[in-house]
UniProtKB/Swiss-Prot annotation:
Keywords: Activator, Nucleus, Transcription, Transcription regulation. Residues 226-236, 341-377 have a biased composition (Polar residues). One of its GO terms (cellular component) is mediator complex. One of its GO terms (biological process) is regulation of transcription by RNA polymerase II. This is Mediator of RNA polymerase II transcription subunit 26. Component of the Mediator complex. It comes from Xenopus laevis. Residues 10-87 form the TFIIS N-terminal domain. Belongs to the Mediator complex subunit 26 family. It comes from the Eukaryota. Signal peptide: none annotated. Residues 128-147, 321-338, 450-459 have a biased composition (Basic and acidic residues).
Amino acid sequence: MTAAPVSPREIRERLLQAIDKQSNIQNMVAVLEVISSLEKYPITKEALEETRLGKLINDVRKKTSNEDLAKRAKKLLRNWQKLIEPVTQNEQLVRGIPNLPGSANGGGSHNCKADPAPTNLLAGKPIQELKGRNDIQKAHSPKADKTPKRKRKEHRDGGQGTPGHLSKPNHELFQNSSPPPTNGIGGSPPDNLPSPLDGGLQSNNRLEPAENDKHGKIPINAVRPHTNSPGLVKHPSTSSLLKVVVLQQHSGGLDDALSHQPRSPRCSSFSPRGTRAELATRQHTTYAPKGSAPSPSQRLPGVDSAHQSPLHPSTPPATAKRLESPRQDRVSSPHKPVEQLPSTDCHQVLPRTSQQHIPRSSLVDSQTPRTGFSPESSKLDSDDAASGSDNLKRKKSRLRIECEGQSADGTGKPARVKKERRLTFDVITGQIKPLTLKDPAQVESSAPTEQHRTETDKQDLTLSLPSPFQLTNWKELSGNEIIQSYLHRQSSLLSSSGIQTQSAHYYMSEYLKQEECTKRESRKTHVLVPIVLPSDLPGRTREITSSDTDRIQNQHWPGVNGCHDTQGNWYDWTQCISLDPHGDDGRLNILPYVCLD
């Protein structure tokens, strides 16, 4: 007959019987049998977790002195460890696969770091499937490789190419990106764009038909590169800027038809870089000094003729005159020193004046990109800011004249006098008073009302508020020389100003006097009253009577049932007394019957 198979619980019980609580082996034969049975038994992970046999075997291995048993237990534990941790090894295998080039977000030339996939998804997939996916991505990496090169070429040209070349990335963006959210205008198809953009798209289709054919040759299962990947679109704000430009062109088409211009400046370029460059240069010219003339490199050959054409047709003639006159003065005398404005004035005045005097069409033109930078437009902006800052300066000077007491009309009207705000706080009375009054007329006019008000305030304050010097902790301040010199100087200032009050020095001296008195009193020694031996001693000179027993039980009898100290306190023989025999605040705790020499 064959024995029944042993379960892990029975093995655990047998092992626990063979060892004690500190895992010391009590029965070596039983432990060796348990190790042999565990080496033969096909144990599972669930059984190990349930019985905690690994911990028991490890404790036995540490405590045993038998090397053969320790080696067998260690080998057994290693086998169990492999059984418990296969999942982590698979994760390490998947994690150890290197990132292959040609991924969707990097292209061939950009070895961007790919985001690691979740391990729970990759653990169950074979490595061949991963290799197949990377091979598919490799096959289509030249397309992703061409796009960044073309982008770099456009940025090197600086946005000065033909409209057809510039609109090609826009055409790819419209094809690859998902349609924008329809908010009324943004969902319109590319067919509704103005004629220059249509021409650019048609020329783009004629120039590069092979590039568009490559999109159709991509297999269905291949991973298309995402439009937001850094290899395709370098600037995240490019698409948003292009949408703004297209919407502005679509809304401004009627204005272009009415103005009869030979060529509108907003239709010449669609490069978002031009927009940023122009905004930066406009800011620099706004904060530049007014007297500096533009350099010849900034002045283009067709600037003067283009400026004479009606770029701002809806500008009022009064505004044009006001904008034109400072520029004519500067042209007539270019080396004339002009007053430079602070940058803060220009910054404060420019938004206000530009919103007041520039109409809507010119604002739209200022937001749209232009082919070149015109120094004349920067002159107009700086002149506009200068005129607004002149008005602000005029207002400031008028306010300053009125505050200083001069009449604005030139007549003899009584002007307002500046308020005297030099006040001081009187620490004695707790009132706020003017320190010095410059104008004697003001002193005479304000004297009656001030006197009446301060008298009532004085009465209330003297009744209600104590002096702050009486509430001060003078013990801490009395030993400080800096505080003493400061208070002495303050008291001299108060006495020189004519205020008849008790100074801080007075309170300091009073406090010091009190401190001296208390110190003298504290220097007195605190001892027991010396007991004079009486001539009448009951029990020695005479017999003890009932009055003696009553006195010793119910009355204070110095030297018999207690004693007095120098402060008049009575102490029983069993009470502890705290004395100061030397007067130096040193306390001596003794019992009253102790004799002090």
